[in-house]
């Protein structure tokens, strides 16, 4: 077997992108392995850093969501449905609605009460989201 055939075989079966066997054994022993070892270590280090950053972002997002939820809960307690009933009585009577129909909707209509509660929750969650944005800017 001539040297070219042997070189081709080694290149085909080599895992490195260049022919390692052409490097002197002394160089391979001292520098080559330490270079690849440090490169592998750097690759693991970079991967670990990326994963740590990903987890940090995840925990920040969880903390933000928890802060928003707590703020929304507090706001929801301060915004009961009877305040909306009073608002509707004050303003809708001027536009043809009777006090009795408004009171019946707020007191007796379960579907209306459920949808009103959903709407109030949506309002306070949106306001809480914007409040956390404003607080984080400062």
UniProtKB/Swiss-Prot annotation:
2 forms, GamL and GamS are isolated from overproducing cells; the shorter form (GamS) is more abundant. As both have good ribosome-binding sites they may be independently translated. GamS is processed at the N-terminus and starts on Tyr-44 and Ile-46; both start sites are present in equal amounts. In cells with an induced lambda prophage a protein consistent with the size of GamL was isolated. GO terms for biological process: symbiont-mediated evasion of DNA end degradation by host; symbiont-mediated suppression of host innate immune response. GO terms for molecular function: deoxyribonuclease inhibitor activity. Gene3D superfamilies: Host-nuclease inhibitor protein Gam (1.10.10.2020). The keyword Transmembrane does not apply. The keyword Ribonucleoprotein does not apply. Homodimer. Interacts with host RecBCD without displacing any of the subunits; this interaction prevents RecBCD from binding to DNA. The GamS isoform makes extensive contacts with RecB, and inserts deeply into the RecBCD complex. Both GamL and GamS bind to host RecBCD nuclease and inhibit its activities, protecting the viral DNA against RecBCD mediated degradation. Isoform GamS mimics DNA, preventing RecBCD from binding DNA. Expression of this protein in E.coli renders cells more sensitive to fluoroquinolone antibiotics (which inhibit topoisomerases and induce dsDNA breaks). Frameshift mutations that delete most of this protein (starting from position 78 or 97 of GamL) allow the bacteriophage to overcome the retron Ec48 bacteriophage defense system. This is Host-nuclease inhibitor protein gam. The gene is gam.
């Amino acid at each position: 077997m001539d040297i070219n055939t042997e070189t081709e075989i080694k290149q085909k079966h080599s895992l490195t992108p260049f022919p390692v066997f052409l490097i002197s054994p002394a160089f391979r022993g001292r520098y080559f392995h330490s270079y690849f070892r440090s490169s592998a270590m750097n690759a693991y280090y970079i991967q670990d850093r990326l994963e740590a950053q990903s987890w940090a972002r995840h925990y920040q997002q969880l903390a933000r969501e928890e802060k928003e939820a707590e703020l929304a809960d507090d706001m929801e307690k301060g915004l009961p449905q009877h305040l909306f009933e009073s608002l509707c009585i004050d303003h809708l009577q001027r536009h043809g609605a009777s006090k009795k129909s408004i009171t019946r909707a707020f007191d007796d209509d379960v579907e209306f009460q459920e949808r009103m509660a959903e709407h109030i929750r949506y309002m306070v969650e949106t306001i809480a989201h914007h409040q956390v944005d404003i607080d984080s800017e400062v």
